[in-house]
Amino acid sequence: LLNSAEYHASARGFGMKALNDANHTWVLSRLTIEMFDMPVVHTNFVLSTWIENVYRLFTNRNYRISSPETGKVYGYARSVWAMINYADRLPVDLHLMHGQTMDTWACPDEDCPIEKQGRVRPLADDTFVKNVEMKYSDIDYNGHVNSIKYIEHICDLFSLDYYKEHH
């Protein structure tokens, strides 16, 4: 998903290379994935991505995972991205930075039927589960925990018994 976002953005002039040259970078803020079905092993699939909206400080990007042969949709994803200044880590105004040019790529009418994600609120019962030690291989180009490692750390919070019971 993240690589397809990069390819899509790069082809339109606001990928990582162009941003890095301007001392900016993209930061993934939220990601929601809903799969209705899973392609079986060795099945080809198509991953489509598009920008839903561009706001001042963030943009919404959606994804569709489908069969190239039948068009069957396996699932959708929604993501929220912010652009930051790499030096001071402050958000960049997307409209000033690109003079609304990103808006020309927005497809607000493209269907993405999964619910829009909101902010994750603190749990009422915030019981400590465990400390997670970050290692060099956990960190991405921006100095953040990379997305795959983040998901691995979350998955590792649950026991094997939990997964067997809730598969």
Predicted regions and their residues:
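Structured core of small recognition/catalytic domains
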Residues: 144-167
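Flexible, active-site-adjacent loop/turn segments at secondary-structure boundaries
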Residues: 26, 82, 137
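A broad, structural micro-motif
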Residues: 26-28, 74, 145
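HotDog/MaoC-like acyl-thioester-processing domains
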Residues: 34-124
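Short amphipathic
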Residues: 124-137
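A generic structural signal for short, non-catalytic loop/turn and secondary-structure boundary residues
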Residues: 21-26, 72, 123-127, 165
